[in-house]
Amino acid sequence: MKMNKKIIKIILAIIIIAIIGSLLYFNNMFKLLNDENNSGIQENIQTENNINNSIENNVTNIVNDQVTSDNNTTDGIEKNNLVSYNGMLKIENNTLVNSKGEKIQLKGISTHGIQWYGKYANEKVIKNLRDEWGANLFRIAMYTSEGGYLQDRTIKNKVYEIADIAIKLDMYVIIDWHILDDNDPLQHINEAQEFFEETSLKYGNTPNIIYEICNEPNGDITWKNNIKPYAEKVISTIRENSKENIIIVGTGTWCQDVDKAAEDPINDKNVMYSLHFYAGTHTEWLRERASKALKTIPIFVSEWGVSDATGNGGIYLDEANKWMKFMKQNNISWANWSLSDKNEASALLLPNTPENDISDKYLSESGKFVKEAIKD
């Protein structure tokens, strides 16, 4: 049906141009019959030829434009879910909206650590996630430790390479400062400011970019004494160059303590607060906590999985479905963990999946579930 409509448009355009061309042709023939000057006749013949050539060129251009349009068409996602329609995102009434003030739910995929599984974060795969899965969001997990930024500054180049692909594909992209073992964000605040100063300077007010400034604060730290002071300084650094972009701030206990952030939010109109869940561990009690927090702050689920919190303990699809319903009802955006072939339950791909092929035959049970969840 889609192709038939496009063919009809092409035919109609050709007919219209042909009618116009015919009128011009007969007008010139009339002039020819009334013109006894041979040179004038030659000039009019040349004019006629030019008109015919112009008609042919216009028809060719229309057909070529239609072919280009076909190549840019996305089957799995509506165009109005992409950046070209929604523009710079913002927060209104504790929920995410687009530049027109319309509610928007971002749904997509997070990489695993790009120092290990970065090969899957390539243009062919990300385009497939957009076109076949319907994803409008891609999250880049740049670990700070474990061979990440603190050990190898050049990993930022991989981050920028992936971000540029997502921008090219008209998607939103989260640049994630992925703390984990280095549990206290204050521990490496200087390095964080260094990275986000450079990154925000590079991307400025590019509407695709979302900053996530501390993945999962954990251990013996608090919102008041560790996370909020860190966030305020890093946010100030980003705002020097990126005035309006959404910034996601992690919360305590591996991003479960959204209630603490709700009691003492950051003074920035476009900050969101991260909630992470794994379906086998985090159940109704965490949804209840999130519901209360939503009365005060906007929440972004920047990481979740169908397994338990280890990433490799079972598949809990019933509980995962409850979370999908909860996030849809509350317009909570999300990114699933993870785009990798790691031998664990939360990985979207089976072990030894080729780096350019995420077709259904290579999807894990988690991958199949998440693909359908994005489409819903």
Segments the model singles out, each with a brief description of its role:
Residues 32-36, 40-48, 53-137, 373:
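N-terminal carbohydrate-binding accessory modules
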Residues 122-182, 189-194, 239-241, 319-330:
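Aromatic-lined substrate-binding rim segments of carbohydrate-active enzymes
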Residues 17-28:
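Hydrophobic alpha-helical membrane-insertion segments, chiefly the h-region
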Residues 98, 176, 303:
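Acidic active-site catalytic centers that drive phospho-/nucleotidyl reactions
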Residues 2-16:
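N-terminal Sec-pathway targeting helices
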Residues 87-89, 113, 118, 172, ...:
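Extracellular glycoside hydrolase catalytic/binding regions
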Residues 110, 144, 177-181, 215-217, ...:
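Short, histidine-centered active-site or binding-site loop motifs used for metal coordination
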